[in-house]
Amino acid sequence: MEKNWYVVHTYSGYENKVKTNLEKRVESMDMTDKIFRVMVPVEEETEVKNGKSKQVSRKVFPGYVLVEMVMTDDSWYVVRNTPGVTGFVGSAGAGSKPTPLLPEEVDAILRQMGMQEERQVEIDFQLKESVKVKEGPFANFIGTIEEIQLDKRKLKVHVNMFGRETPVELEFTQIEKI
């Protein structure tokens, strides 16, 4: 049996309580080999009230908790009967096993929460290489790559404007090799 991520429906506002309850049940019922992670997806936002900014955590999916588990009768029973859980998302009726999330969906959620590195983009550009700008206000200008910022997916390119070298920040998709 392989482990997958499943979505559990809870009473709205009880997501963290369900997470705590389920983690305690997993420990007490010795299910650590079947139920691995319980997660309430949140994202950090900056909220401005009365001119003051404050960091707040906002639930991405209110009323839902993600559970990484191996689906067996026992693990299914433990999760379903946790206080606050109203059922699994994707089960077609009473007693039927739910459908797991697709790996791409899990990757997107974990990336959104900052828990997984975004897959690196392969770039085929080198410093001091001559390139042509494909789009934007500098379209058709020829320039030289001076800096590559992989984390931002941008490049600093010096283009010749009015007889002077001018630094321009561009995205990878805005340039092409010449």
UniProtKB/Swiss-Prot annotation:
Residue ranges annotated for the KOW domain, each copy included: 130-159
- Organism's domain of life? Bacteria
UniProt-listed SUPFAM superfamilies: N-utilization substance G protein NusG, N-terminal domain, Translation proteins SH3-like domain
Q: Which InterPro entries match?
A: KOW, NGN, NGN-like_dom, NGN_dom_sf, NusG-like, Rib_uL2_dom2, Transcrpt_antiterm_NusG, Transcrpt_antiterm_NusG_bac_CS
One GO BP annotation of this record: regulation of DNA-templated transcription elongation
Keyword ATP-binding present in the record's keywords: the answer is no
The record's annotation in SMART domains points to: KOW, NGN
Spell out the CDD domains in the cross-references.
Answer: KOW_NusG (cd06091), NGN_Bact_1 (cd09891)
| GO CC terms of this entry | cytosol
Q: What's in the keyword line of the UniProt record?
A: Transcription, Transcription antitermination, Transcription regulation, Transcription termination
Per the record, a Pfam family? KOW
UniProt family annotation? Belongs to the NusG family.
Fetch the HAMAP family from UniProt: NusG
Q: What does this protein do?
A: Participates in transcription elongation, termination and antitermination.
Recorded protein name is Transcription termination/antitermination protein NusG
Species name: Halalkalibacterium halodurans (strain ATCC BAA-125 / DSM 18197 / FERM 7344 / JCM 9153 / C-125) (Bacillus halodurans)
Q: List the gene name.
A: nusG
